[in-house]
Amino acid sequence: MNKSENESKYWVACGALWVAFSILLGAAGKHILMADGAEIRAENLNTASQFGMIMGLSLMVLAALRWMRFWSAYAPWPERLLGTGLLLFSGGLAARSLAPESMVSDLLSPCIPCGGVLLSAGFFLVAIQTIAVLYVKNDRE
């Protein structure tokens, strides 16, 4: 098993953990924050949960495609960008929602837009790599 296959398995596991974590975030927003009357914080946590589920599934699909050698010639930068972006974006929103007056929340709040930029960059790179793979395959035919 080569290094790329190991990293692909790592990203599948990370994606699955993000989906599981997102389910818990959604439950916390619905049952804890809404019960306390903190609707805005609950909405932020819901956004973090939704992004976590979608991006976690995306990580799993991208890593599985790489594992099946669809993108074997390319480094796994889309997964790295998506994983880091998800951590900054959803993690920052979750911290701001669950502990709004804490130092951690103050430190992570500026990371939220950076995470969004990394998420977008990751998907742009997916598009570029896919076009490159299709171009190379069509060139060989």
PLM regions and their residue ranges:
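Helix-boundary and loop/linker segments of multi-pass membrane transporters
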Residues: N2-S8, A35-A38, F70-S72
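Interfacial helix-loop-helix junctions of multi-pass membrane proteins
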Residues: K30-N44, L93-C114
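Interfacial segments of alpha-helical transmembrane regions
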Residues: E5-V19, A73-L82
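Juxtamembrane helix-break-helix junctions at the cytosolic face
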Residues: A63-A75, L98-E101
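Core segments of alpha-helical transmembrane spans in multipass integral membrane proteins
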Residues: L17-A27, E43-M68, R80-G91
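Short, charged juxtamembrane terminal tails flanking transmembrane helices
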Residues: M1-S4, L134-E141
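Hydrophobic alpha-helical segments of small multi-pass membrane proteins
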Residues: P76-R96, L108-A127
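Hydrophobic cores of alpha-helical transmembrane segments in multi-pass inner/ER membrane proteins
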Residues: G52-L62, V117-Q129
